[in-house]
Amino acid sequence: MAFARFPLLRLLGSFIAGILSYIYFSEILVPFKIENFYISTGIIVLYVLLVIAQFYINLKTNVSLVADIALFILGYQLCYYQDLSHHSSFIGNKISFNETQLVIVKPKDVVVHKDQYSKLFVKSFKIYDAQKGKWENIKGDILVYSSFDLDSIYQPDAYYLLSAKLQAPSSSQNPYLFNYAEYLKKQDVYYVAYIKNKSELKFLHKQKILDIRELALITRYKIIKYFKSNVYLSETNKNIAIALLTGFDDELDNEIIQSFVYSGTLHILSVSGFHTGLLFLLITFIFSLIDP
C-alpha cells in the first residue's frame, strides 16, 4: 500500500511509535527530557510556521518530517503524563513517610470485604502540609484497609478526612509473579493506608453536584445494599446476583469464579446486566431520534 496516498496512516505511525517508545524505552528516554512540553511546543510552532511557509516556497519534505517528530513526541507525552507520578502535584511529592498524614478523600468504589478486614479505594484531593500550614491539591489515589467494617461509615457521595500513615505497596521481586503494586498503579493508586478505628476516617460533608460516574457509583451501592439486606438468599447466591447486575465480583469465592472460567462465561461478570441494560437504553434512544 502506498502511504503517499494515505498520509494520515503514515502520520499515525509516528504517533503510535511515540506511544510504544514510552512503553518499552521510558527508562532510557525520560532522562533526556523528551517529556518536556517546551520541546514539543517549539516543534509544533515550527510545524505551523512551515505549513504557512510552504504556500510560498516548496517545503513539503520538511513539513512532513517536522509533523512526524511532533506526533512522535505527542504520543510519548500523552503516555508520560498518564502516569500521575510525573505530575508536580503527585501525592508522593507531598507526604512525609512514617508520619501521620491528613488527606481529604472520596470513595472511588464500594467497600470490599475480605476475611477479617475491609478495603476501600479512595480518590485523594488535598493533603495538609504542616510545614507550610496549608492544604495543597494532590493527585494519586489511596487504598484504605480497615480492621472494622467500613460500611458503617461509607457514603458514596461523601468526602472524608483520612488520618493515617501512607505506605507504598510492596512490589514483587520475581518478574514471573503477579505485581500488585503495578496493578494498583494502573488504577492510579500509589499508596496504602491501614486504619483501626472510625476516627481515622472522619465524615466531612456530602458532594453537592454529582457527575455521571458518581451517580453510577450511588446506583451500584444501592443495588448491592438492597441485595445484602433485603433478599432472602444465601451469601453465595447474593454475591452472584450482585456480580451479574453490577459487575462487582470482588467478594465472589474463588470456586465460583473458576466455575465461570471453566464454562467460558466469565465475561458475564465483567459486563453486568445493569451495564448491558444502560447500553441498550442508550442505543434505543439514539435510534428513536433517527427514526421515531
Range-by-range predicted roles:
Residues A2, T61-H267:
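Membrane-interface helix/helix-cap signal primarily in integral membrane proteins
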Residues F3-F55:
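Membrane-embedded alpha-helical segments of integral membrane proteins
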Residues F6, R10, G18, N58-L59, ...:
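Hydrophobic alpha-helical transmembrane segments in multi-pass membrane proteins
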Residues I19, L50, F72-Y76, F280:
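Alpha-helical transmembrane segments
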Residues S21, K119, S171, H275-L278:
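Short hydrophobic/aromatic residue motifs in ordered secondary structure
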Residues Y24-I28, F32, Y56, K60, ...:
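Membrane-interface elements of multi-pass transporters and channels
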Residues S26, N137, F280-I283:
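Short, function-defining helix-loop hinge/capping sites that tune catalysis or transport
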